Amino acid sequence: EGATIILGFAGVGLIGPIIGNTIIEQIDDLKEIGFVASDMLPPISTFYDGKLKHPFRLYYSPNYNLILGISEVPFQISSAYNDLAKTICNWALSDDVKAKEIVVFQGIPQKGMINEFPVYYASEDSQIKQFEEDGIEKVEKGIIVGPEATIINEALTNKLKPLALFTPVYQIPTPEGAASIIEV
């Protein structure tokens, strides 16, 4: 009850999976609790250190009351994200989970060299004060696209507090941007 759900999707800069896999390495009691299976996922499997894994996995840490979802591949049909968002948010609000917030990440594509990787946020009013105290800048306006957008829209419709964290990224995997978000 009261868990935070962190979802890392494979988007620009791959910061979602990079952040998710880094969290797995850093939190000792984070254990795989399940996976998401869908005909809308491309025919891809993943493996780490020779161990096969589902491309969309769920983990839980009792010490941090944290649920982590990592999708290392995009869905084949973008309209499937709406169903995914409804399923995740309904599960998050179920009596088994009763989550309080959902956190997503999105890279801001940049051209050329990126010298700094500042972190920006977009959230509901109740979270703004904490970010201001921590010195994290808000995004004044913009759009969020992809699975992160459908998750946020569904969370806003329900009783979940959505939070989006952004950082500049290259069009290729950008671990520097992911590291900036992890520090927050």
Where are the regions a protein language model picked out?
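Short beta-strand segments
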Residues: 7-9, 69-70, 104-106, 166-168
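N-terminal catalytic or cofactor-binding beta/alpha core of small enzyme domains
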Residues: 1-98, 157
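Internal, conserved structured core segments that host functional sites
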Residues: 76-128
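Catalytic cores of processing enzymes, dominated by hydrolases/peptidases
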Residues: 54, 109-184
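Gly/Ser/Thr-rich loops at beta-strand to alpha-helix junctions
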Residues: 9-15, 75, 106-112, 170-173
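Residue-level detector of short coil/turn "hinge" positions at structural boundaries
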Residues: 30-31, 100-101, 138, 162
